[in-house]
C-alpha cells in the first residue's frame, strides 16, 4: 500500500470515530442522536460537493476521480437511514406471491450463493459488504467463511458488532480496503460475490480485474450488478435524468450500461457462465414495490412496518421527522439533505424500474479459467 493510500485510510478511520462515536451499537434513526454535529455537516458536504446537477463529461470525470472519498462519505451519512428502512441487507430482490420481505431478501442471497457454487469450507470474498447482512446469511446458509471488503469504517464497525452478537465472529470477518486496489495476495479466494456494490467503482474493468486477480484459478465470481439496460439511451434527456437521480441518491459516480459490464468481465479474462437480468420478468410484485407506496403489493402483515418506512408516504413522514429533529438539534445539520438525496434515488429507481431502463439485479456468474496464472 502506498504512503498516500495509508494516509487516506488513517484519516477516514479517525473521521469515522469522531463522527459516529458510540452510535455503532444503535441502529436506524436512533443512531443519529449519537453523531458529532460538526463532523456530520462535513461528511454531508464532502458527499454533495460533486452533485450540482451537472451531467457533462467534466462533472462525471470529477466524480469518477473522487470515487473513494465520495463513496466513503456517502455511506457515512446514509447507513443509518438504510438500516432504518431496509435492515442489514442493502439490496433489492424479486418478490414471489405470499412471500415476506425478509424471506425474499434471504432467498435472493441464497440464490446468488447457489449459482456461485459456494459450499462449506470455501473462503469467500464479499466485495462491498455493507454492514454484513448478506455475508452473515450466506455464511449460515452454506457453512463457508466470508471476508467482507468495505472502504467505510462505520459499516465495518457495525458489521463486526452484528457478527459478534450473532456468534459469527469466527466465520465472518471484515477488512478495510479499496476494491480497485485490494490488499489480498493473488489467488486467495475460492469464490467471490458482490451484491449491488461494484456499481460504485469508477470502472467495471478495474474492479473486475482485481476480483479476477484475487480469485483462485477455476474459482467463480457472481454478482448482482446495477446497470442501465439495453433500452437506455445516453442522449435522451429523460433517460439521463433518471440515471442522474440514481447516481445522486445512491453515491454512484457513473451509471454504466449492461454492455460495459459484460465487456469488462470478458476483457479481464472471465468466462461468463450466466448472463441474466433477474428484474426482466412478469412477476406480479415488482422489485421496486417497497418504494412505490402501492399498498396492493404488500404480501404479509410482517411487511407493514417495512412498507411504512420505505414507501413514498413513509419517506415523507421520515423527512418531516428528521427535519424536526434537526430543528430541535436532536439530529445533526445536514440530515435533511441526506433524506432529500435518498428521495431522488427512490424517484430514479422507480422510474428506471417501471420503464425497464435500469436493473439492480443483472446477474453475472463468471469463472476464472483453470489455466489462468
Swiss-Prot record:
GO BP: ergosterol biosynthetic process; methylation
Enzyme class: transferase
GO cellular component: endoplasmic reticulum; lipid droplet
Pathway the protein takes part in: Steroid metabolism; ergosterol biosynthesis; ergosterol from zymosterol: step 1/5
Catalytic activity: zymosterol + S-adenosyl-L-methionine = fecosterol + S-adenosyl-L-homocysteine + H(+)
Assigned EC number: 2.1.1.41
Transmembrane segments: none
Keywords assigned: Lipid biosynthesis, Lipid metabolism, Methyltransferase, S-adenosyl-L-methionine, Steroid biosynthesis, Steroid metabolism, Sterol biosynthesis, Sterol metabolism, Transferase
CDD domains (alphabetical): AdoMet_MTases
One MF term in the entry's GO annotations: sterol 24-C-methyltransferase activity
Family the entry assigns: Belongs to the class I-like SAM-binding methyltransferase superfamily. Erg6/SMT family.
Protein name: Sterol 24-C-methyltransferase
UniProt organism field: Eremothecium gossypii (strain ATCC 10895 / CBS 109.51 / FGSC 9923 / NRRL Y-1056) (Yeast)
